[in-house]
Amino acid sequence: METFNNVINSGQLVLVDFFATWCQPCKAMHPILEQVKSVLGDRIRIIKVDMDKYGETASQFRIQSVPTLMLFRNGEVLWRTSGVVDKAELLATLDPFLT
């Protein structure tokens, strides 16, 4: 099983969704992320981190609110935002990093 650090330190573009099961905006992000994944396919990896289960990881990245999205490549944070992001905005934000 890959560890979180192995995944974000890879050369692949990785979008991390820090969420909580009780969070309504997080639930709204789920289908948006599925749609983004269906559009981008293997060009991006999307993983979800439940901050109630993995609080240490959330603390490491100073996650204060959920949902928080972070984009990584080679361990570097390329982009970060909190709150719900619609599909079009998320695709437009990710596009420059896909090359």
Name these PLM-found stretches.
Residues 20, 51, 74:
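Active-site loop/turn elements of alpha/beta-hydrolase fold enzymes
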Residues 15-16, 46, 69:
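Hydrophobic beta-strand anchors of alpha/beta hydrolase catalytic cores
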Residues 61-70:
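Structural micro-motif
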Residues 1-13, 55:
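A short beta-strand-turn-helix
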Residues 27-39:
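Typically the conserved alpha-helix immediately C-terminal to a functionally engaged Cys/Sec
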Residues 51-58:
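Structural microenvironment flanking redox-active thiols in thiol-disulfide oxidoreductases
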